[in-house]
């Protein structure tokens, strides 16, 4: 096959992606399939980092709307991402990978603290790095955490796996005539009011000229195909 188009990537997975057909928690078959995809990409020569959301376990913003203190809820959400990171670490290690979980909040008996230079070193040594607990601050989503970590480690591409296979001009679940974009600039996303990721995360990626690809991960082998340069999903980069 062709050489890889990207040397170092950060893959953002939603917590819901781990649920499979369930309403809550982690489906072992799903996390095992995702782990195979990640290892396949790494074995092809890519340095791979992951950020996983926590929505399959807990959503701080949702409970805040019901009266819970927002900061407390967000801290609980951060812990949910650590749970998912540990589950993914276990799945990857069972397949023979070397993995390090690095948290933005201190849980020293469970995982490492996030230290930028150490994270980069892990990747250079062939380890998969999983970044947990978002940015470590309330009021920021795991999308923001993914964008921040991708910039910090010097990722060539931020990949966001979603339930749909790219960015559309309108909701494809509600509109049969929805059109998918193959590529967009950051300015076009803003002007057209398209939903790609939350505002803070989007601003981070745009201001750092970080290429972002939105894609669906339901098809086996899709991550490796992207690494080899196939135009899958929607690529967001540059300015108009």
Curated annotation (Swiss-Prot):
Residues annotated as binding ATP: 12-15, 55, 59, 162, 168, 171
Stored Pfam families: AA_kinase
Binding site for UMP: 54, 74, 135-142
Pathway in which this enzyme or protein is active: Pyrimidine metabolism; CTP biosynthesis via de novo pathway; UDP from UMP (UMPK route): step 1/1
CDD domains: AAK_UMPK-PyrH-Ec (cd04254)
Gene Ontology MF terms: ATP binding; UMP kinase activity
Record text on subunit structure and interactions: Homohexamer.
Family: Belongs to the UMP kinase family.
UniProt-listed NCBIfam families: pyrH_bact (TIGR02075)
Its job: Catalyzes the reversible phosphorylation of UMP to UDP.
Protein name (Swiss-Prot/TrEMBL): Uridylate kinase
Gene name for this UniProt entry: pyrH
């Amino acid at each position: 096959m062709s050489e890889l188009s990207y040397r170092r990537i950060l893959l953002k997975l939603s917590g819901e992606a781990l649920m499979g057909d369930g309403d809550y928690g982690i489906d072992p078959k799903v996390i095992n399939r995702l782990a195979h995809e990640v290892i396949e990409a790494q074995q092809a020569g890519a340095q791979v980092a992951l950020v996983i959301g926590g929505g399959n376990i807990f959503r701080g913003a949702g409970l805040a709307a019901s009266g819970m203190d927002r900061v407390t809820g967000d801290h609980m959400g951060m812990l949910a991402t650590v749970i998912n990171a540990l589950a993914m670490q276990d799945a990857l290690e069972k397949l023979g990978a070397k993995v390090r979980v690095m948290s933005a909040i201190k849980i020293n008996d469970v995982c490492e603290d996030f230290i930028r230079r150490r994270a980069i070193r892990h990747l250079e040594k062939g380890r998969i790095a999983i970044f947990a607990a978002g940015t470590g601050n309330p009021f920021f989503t795991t999308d923001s955490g993914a964008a921040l970590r991708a910039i910090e480690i010097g990722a060539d591409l931020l990949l966001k796996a979603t339930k749909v296979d790219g960015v559309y001009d309108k909701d494809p679940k509600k509109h049969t005539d929805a059109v998918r974009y193959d590529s967009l600039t950051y300015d076009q996303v803003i002007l057209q009011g398209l939903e790609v990721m939350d505002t803070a995360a989007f601003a981070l990626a745009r201001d750092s000229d970080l290429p972002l690809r939105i894609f669906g991960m339901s098809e086996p082998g899709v991550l490796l195909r992207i690494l080899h340069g196939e135009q899958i999903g929607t690529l967001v980069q540059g300015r108009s």
